[in-house]
């Protein structure tokens, strides 16, 4: 009882103690990115590790590029994961021993795929990184714009505000997909069914 009384007295006294002034430098440097794409409610600009606390725009753009790329890959991964979990598989065999695609499990696929198949996957990823998923023509209007003057799908018909809104939607969906694919992998490791039976 004495301990509870003493603790409440200390807490009460602490309420009236002068507050320590917060450093203003981090707030001032982060204000440079408050209006950037992705600084959206409810969090606003969120940089808990202080990766861009120095206000370096080039570093911010590089991190944004990486975030967009990982978000896009994660969105594809979630869809692919759910499609194969629903039982949709490629026909045929994966190797000469007769192992079918249907026999290969989701996460354990890396253990089941032959070494030659993994080399092909890595080569394909390298081709994408070096020749497809980048601004090859210098025509990019924003970070992550990989149209390269060839693909439009009506993007240029939108006004600037709509384009910004759609880019923000893509960024948020990518963030959610990154969490989603991680959750799907955890569920599989726990042995939890991903789809309703």
From Swiss-Prot:
GO BP of this protein: photosynthesis, light harvesting
Cellular location(s): Plastid, Chloroplast thylakoid membrane
Transit peptide: 1-31
InterPro entries: Chloro_AB-bd_pln, Chloroa_b-bind
Signal peptide limits: none
Gene Ontology MF annotations: chlorophyll binding
Pfam families in UniProt: Chloroa_b-bind
GO CC terms of this entry: chloroplast thylakoid membrane; light-harvesting complex; photosystem II
Keyword entries, A-Z: Chlorophyll, Chloroplast, Chromophore, Light-harvesting polypeptide, Membrane, Photosynthesis, Photosystem II, Plastid, Thylakoid, Transit peptide, Transmembrane, Transmembrane helix
Membrane topology: Multi-pass membrane protein
Segments passing through the bilayer: 73-94, 114-133, 174-196
Similarity comment: family membership: Belongs to the fucoxanthin chlorophyll protein family.
Function: The light-harvesting complex (LHC) functions as a light receptor, it captures and delivers excitation energy to photosystems with which it is closely associated. Energy is transferred from the carotenoid and chlorophyll C (or B) to chlorophyll A and the photosynthetic reaction centers where it is used to synthesize ATP and reducing power.
The protein's assembly and partners: The LHC complex of chromophytic algae is composed of fucoxanthin, chlorophyll A and C bound non-covalently by fucoxanthin chlorophyll proteins (FCPs). The ratio of the pigments in LHC; fucoxanthin: chlorophyll C: chlorophyll A; (0.6-1): (0.1-0.3): (1).
Name of the protein described by the UniProt record: Fucoxanthin-chlorophyll a-c binding protein D, chloroplastic
